[in-house]
Amino acid sequence: ECSAIATNRLGSSFDIQGGGSDLKFPHHEFSAAHAEAALGVKRMAQSYVHTGMIGLDGTKMSKSLGNLVFVHKLVEAGVDPSAIRLGVFAGHYRADRDWSDDVLRTAQERLQRWREALSHPGTVEEVKEVIQHLRLALADDLDTPRAIAVLDEWAKKAPESGEATEEASDLLRTAVNSLLGVRL
């Protein structure tokens, strides 16, 4: 049914199909075989992107165990969506990883440090260099842990720069929001 839904919505061939690593085999391979045989196309999806599984405190999250963490419930509880995003981005998208109160706390602290560092971001040229390194990390298989490390390093050095221009702050704020979806 997945190949029927995908090809109905996206056509007989499309660029990217994604899902959890647990769907790689046999699910995605069977779906592709069905669609390719039925529609006579060489490849249903040109690329497949499979994410790692996220566990909770060392246990696989599942409906049957009742241990799911819902983003909307975290937001309803007052958690900043940008902190949630940073917590998820702390691990590479293909790697299995764990969600915990510690992961969230670390992400919240990181977000606060980045926001504080915006008051003295460095020169426009320095900020442009940070953004370039951020882009390079994301261009390398969406390496969000490396992207976060780039911004952590910037935030650590920011107080030393003493430079505070609204242009530099706005430039970095816009880049981080655009590239990571994190609001500073």
Question: Model-predicted segments: where are they?
Answer:
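Feature 926 captures the class I aminoacyl-tRNA synthetase adenylation module centered on the KMSKS loop
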Residues: 38, 42, 81, 91-184
